[in-house]
Amino acid sequence: MAGNVYERELRKILSGEREFIEKMVKTFSEEERSLYLKITERPFLVLRAAGSFGIDIIAIRDDFSFPIEVKSSIYEVFRFTMSNGRAQEQIISHMEITSRAGIFPVYAYRLKRVKGDPWRLFAPPGMQVRGNMALIYRLLPKLETTGS
């Protein structure tokens, strides 16, 4: 499947589309299922981000705004160097642009061919985030970096 299929999938989840979520979570554990269905109670407004900035979607609710970049792979570890360094340049750009607004980019990583919850969310390390966004930032696992 093309990446935009997973982008649409995440948009439907974050928008709280109950029918879609109920179909998706049929094979999930009870805990995963209840967590996914919880979003139907307080969904996000999800906008498709246009242009070459690289952010795919923006999720907004209350005083939270999440610019989200969607990635997918069959591999459990996503390496930003896999695309000739383009993804590395992109994450640096995302960090610079979002830090001016006191927010951070979220990387939604969709694992292909897995049972249960296929989504993993990450934030880049070392961001200076303010307000309520700082709470979320601390909760999300950080992308790991290597020496190269």
Model regions and ranges:
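Short acidic (Asp/Glu) patches
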Residues: 87-93
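Intrinsically disordered, low-complexity terminal regions enriched in charged/polar residues
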Residues: 116-148
